[in-house]
Amino acid sequence: MSMNPFLLTDFYKLTHILQYRPELRELTSYLTPRGSRLKGIDKVVFFGLSAYVHSYVVKNFNDNFFNRNFEYCECEIREVLELGLGYTDEMIDKTIGHFKALHELQYLPVEINAVAEGTLVPMGVPCLEIKSTNPQFFWVGQALEASLSAAIWHPMVSATIAREYRKIA
């Protein structure tokens, strides 16, 4: 896939940068399985993080953000902010400044802590934590959270269902 990874999330997340308090320097996000629609399932198998980190965090960010000319990335982000969210030029410029600084940094300053893949996690218990390692980029973890959730939720559900089938096999 050849798309700016910041555009592979809930696009309104791009607006959060300007909504945080100016003095905020630390933000932690969690992935917590909330519940099951299947009777008798009160735990989920944590699975899919390694693939997400390799294909999305490392490969996609390098290929489609850090290794691209920033002007190209800026045009993509600017288009979403202007046409999709109705941002004014002033708001766009402020937001773009954050992305430009991250592009100049050339890596995602985040730390992801999680239970081991394959762990059976009770519903309502966080299985993953994302936090920034650089106060200037406190917002990056939250920007990743939506895509991470979308990317690993299906593998987690599939692994959980597979576990249930193994019980009866």
Regions found by a protein language model. Give the residues of each.
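Ordered alpha/beta subdomains of enzyme catalytic regions
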Residues: 1-169
